[in-house]
From Swiss-Prot:
Predominant cellular place of this UniProt entry's protein: cytoplasm
Main function: Required for rescue of stalled ribosomes mediated by trans-translation. Binds to transfer-messenger RNA (tmRNA), required for stable association of tmRNA with ribosomes. tmRNA and SmpB together mimic tRNA shape, replacing the anticodon stem-loop with SmpB. tmRNA is encoded by the ssrA gene; the 2 termini fold to resemble tRNA(Ala) and it encodes a 'tag peptide', a short internal open reading frame. During trans-translation Ala-aminoacylated tmRNA acts like a tRNA, entering the A-site of stalled ribosomes, displacing the stalled mRNA.
Keyword hit for Secreted: no
One CC-aspect GO term: cytosol
Protein name: SsrA-binding protein
Subcellular location(s) of the protein: Cytoplasm
Chain residue ranges for the region called Disordered: 131-159
Annotated source species: Rhizobium leguminosarum bv. trifolii (strain WSM2304)
Lineage: Bacteria, Pseudomonadati, Pseudomonadota, Alphaproteobacteria, Hyphomicrobiales
Listed GO biological process terms: trans-translation
Xref: PANTHER family: SSRA-BINDING PROTEIN, TMRNA-BINDING COMPONENT OF TRANS-TRANSLATION TAGGING COMPLEX
Amino acid sequence: MAPKGSQRVVNKVVAENRKARFNYEIIDTYEAGLVLMGTEVKSLREGKANIAESYASDEGGEIWLINSYLPEYLQANRFNHEPRRRRKLLLSGREIHRLRSAVNREGMTLIPLKIYFNDRGRAKMELALAKGKKLHDKRESEKERDWNRQKSRLLKDNG
């Protein structure tokens, strides 16, 4: 139990996949729990994680996080975890069914957006149902972003 004077940080983001919003068109987001070992949680609490190259996949009616990197916890000894192991995601049956049908039918992908700790101290992941952008879509969104920046600069200078 935490000491009386300590304040717990709510929704502390541990890892974020920044390129996801550039490379994919986000259709819908879901909050999923993570099945982790003790050393993985300690490594996450230190703020060490990388989900930039990871994705989620459906296997046997369950959703698994693949290719995420949680480095070994340095104070752990032989009971340490494997850094790139597959991790099970906890979602409701209805959500799993909805995600499976969207991925199979419409050719969408499941990508993690961020890992954070909720107000109860549980590790959670924001999972996105997304569709990959083509090169011209990426260029278009970049032009739009640049134009919005220019507009705000002009309004700031003139206003």
